[in-house]
Design a protein with these regions (language model features):
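Short, solvent-exposed turn/loop segments enriched in Gly/Ser/Thr/Pro and often Arg
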Residues: 33, 159, 204
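Phosphate-coordinating loops and pocket residues in cytosolic domains that bind phosphorylated ligands
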Residues: 45, 193, 202
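Short, flexible loop/turn segments with low-complexity composition
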Residues: 85, 199-204
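Residue-level recognition of oxygen-bearing side chains
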Residues: 67, 183, 196
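GST-like fold's C-terminal all-alpha helical module
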Residues: 97-193
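Active-site-flanking alpha-helical
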Residues: 73, 167-168, 201
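GST-like domain detector, emphasizing the conserved glutathione-binding G-site
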Residues: 1-126
Length: 204
């Protein structure tokens, strides 16, 4: 049975879309207008949250972008894109996966909402600026970690790079990347040059 993924351009669903391309898995892509809960109300019948990503694989339904990436590695035995529990960097690998959304993407979404997406009368410039600074402060662990590394874990590309890479890419799309440290910007450029990322971008 074919994996089905619902996606919006530039949204967190980019993570599993990128992972699918890197892993060479067959899938059916449904691209929706953003936000789908407002512009495609019938989507709520499939996913009551109205969010993307939404992935269906047989009886499995998932809505969390990094969780889907983790599922794909384990379900389809694409261990070259992940680390196993007996690996010495396994804890760090999991930490980067969770760090990507809970620590990095969260403040970005508030910056995006209150600085860019709300009508002018509802914009909150100070709130947006506070969350911009919060996001940049939360990059400190990554800034130090990537100084002498090409990728986050085990000297090779994994879904941890997809998870963190999307957060950096979103920062670029919403104008925060001008404050990235040079090594972090260089890391993002390496990720964007990957064939899987290029193919993903062509399908958006």
């Amino acid at each position: 049975m074919t994996i089905r993924l619902w996606h919006c351009k530039g949204a967190r669903s980019l993570r599993p879309l990128w992972a699918l391309e890197e892993m060479g898995l067959d899938y059916d892509l449904k691209v929706l207008p953003f936000p789908p809960r407002a512009h495609q109300r019938e989507y709520l019948q499939l996913n009551p949250l109205g969010t993307v990503p939404f992935m269906v694989d047989g009886e499995t339904q998932m809505t969390e972008s990094t969780g889907i990436c983790h599922y794909l590695v384990e379900k389809y035995e694409r261990q070259q894109f992940g680390l196993q529990p007996d690996h010495p960097e396994y804890g760090d690998y999991l930490n980067w996966l969770y760090h990507s959304d809970a620590t990095l993407t969260f403040p970005q979404t508030l910056y995006l909402r209150y600085g860019m997406m709300e009508p002018d009368e509802r914009k909150q410039p100070q709130v947006a600026e506070d969350y911009r600074k919060w996001y940049l402060a939360r990059l400190q662990r990554l800034n130090g970690h990537i100084l002498d590394r090409e990728f986050l874990c085990d000297g090779r590309f994994t879904i941890a790079d997809i998870a963190i890479g999307y957060a950096l890419y979103l920062g670029e799309k919403i104008g925060i990347a001008r404050d990235y440290e040079p090594q972090t910007q260089a890391y993002l450029e390496r990720l964007k040059a990957r064939p899987g990322f290029v193919r993903e971008a062509e399908k958006e």
